[in-house]
């Protein structure tokens, strides 16, 4: 049985040479050698194991933000993570059995869009993710890169993350296990490591959220969203390009150099916010 047959046996259809420009917020990127979509955690895990068994490089693609894909594309298997379930822990008891799963946790599969989950939890009167209502990307991306805005970040409310290293069993890592720093984590370091090193596949995450007043929380979230819309570009981009240095802002530094609005080809330093490069 060859690789293509093994993927089909997993119940997943695949494409050859799929343009990744269709799957990134930058709207650029060459072809994926193999491309498949995982709608369930089981499919995601199976595809990771198939790739390992056949020695095919694996890349898991979330929302396509914070990502720059070469015109040469990506070799191996690119899996679009389309797992979308999230809700109170009780809904996941049968699927995710682990002592770290507490009744008061909000659980999300890794492909859940962060902004949509933040809107749902905020409307439900659960405090902690109001900052994320304007953030593109998935839960997995937020967990890996410690996404944040408006004075908070993912690490502030993350309780645990469920991962699988291909060839191994599922593991639950606590927030302390992830060694969070500004826009980074142990998971990010592992994913940026050498290809021969086993890289984690993020499956799900649990968030500890406090009870709050939905009206107050929604007002705060909407203020964050309005502030973002007023200050950030609407053109295709990967989001903020550079991390802020201590005590300053990357956008301010770039603007002070006179680079705001500078353009080469179709790439432009956004005239609205200098820490964004937009695809014109």
State where each predicted segment sits.
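Noncatalytic linker/hinge segments flanking ATPase motor cores
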Residues: 80, 98-102, 109-116, 148-152, ...
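A gly/ser-rich beta-alpha-beta helix-loop segment of oxidoreductase catalytic cores
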Residues: 115-165, 237
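Solvent-exposed alpha-helices and their adjacent loops that cap or buttress functional pockets
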Residues: 26-29, 52-53, 59-61, 69-72, ...
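Structural signature of FAD isoalloxazine-binding scaffolds in flavoprotein oxidoreductases
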Residues: 29, 36-41, 68-92, 144-175, ...
């Amino acid at each position: 049985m060859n690789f293509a047959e093994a993927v089909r046996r997993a119940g997943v259809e695949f494409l050859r040479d799929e343009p990744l420009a269709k799957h990134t917020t930058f709207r650029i990127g060459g072809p994926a050698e193999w491309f498949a979509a995982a709608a369930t955690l089981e499919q995601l895990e199976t595809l990771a194991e198939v790739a390992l068994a056949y020695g095919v490089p694996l890349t898991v693609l979330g929302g396509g933000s914070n990502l720059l894909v070469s015109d040469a594309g990506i070799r191996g298997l690119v899996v679009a993570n389309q797992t979308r379930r999230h809700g109170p822990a009780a809904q996941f008891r049968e699927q995710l059995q682990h002592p770290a799963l507490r009744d008061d946790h909000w659980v999300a599969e890794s492909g859940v869009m962060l902004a949509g989950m933040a809107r749902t939890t905020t409307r439900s009167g659960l405090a902690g993710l109001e900052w994320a209502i304007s953030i593109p990307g998935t839960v997995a991306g937020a967990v890996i890169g410690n996404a944040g805005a408006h004075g908070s970040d993912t690490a502030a409310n993350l309780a645990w993350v469920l991962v699988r290293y291909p060839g191994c069993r599922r593991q639950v890592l606590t927030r302390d296990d992830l060694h969070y720093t500004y826009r980074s984590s142990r998971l990010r370091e592992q994913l940026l490591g050498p290809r021969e090193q086993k890289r984690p596949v993020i499956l799900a995450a649990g968030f500890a959220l406090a009870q709050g007043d939905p009206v107050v929380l929604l007002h705060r979230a909407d203020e964050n969203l309005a502030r973002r819309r007023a200050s950030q570009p609407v053109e295709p981009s990967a989001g903020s390009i550079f991390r802020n240095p201590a005590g300053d802002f990357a956008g301010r530094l770039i603007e002070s150099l006179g680079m705001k609005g500078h353009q080469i080809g179709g790439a432009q330093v956004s005239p609205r916010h200098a820490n964004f490069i937009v695809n014109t």
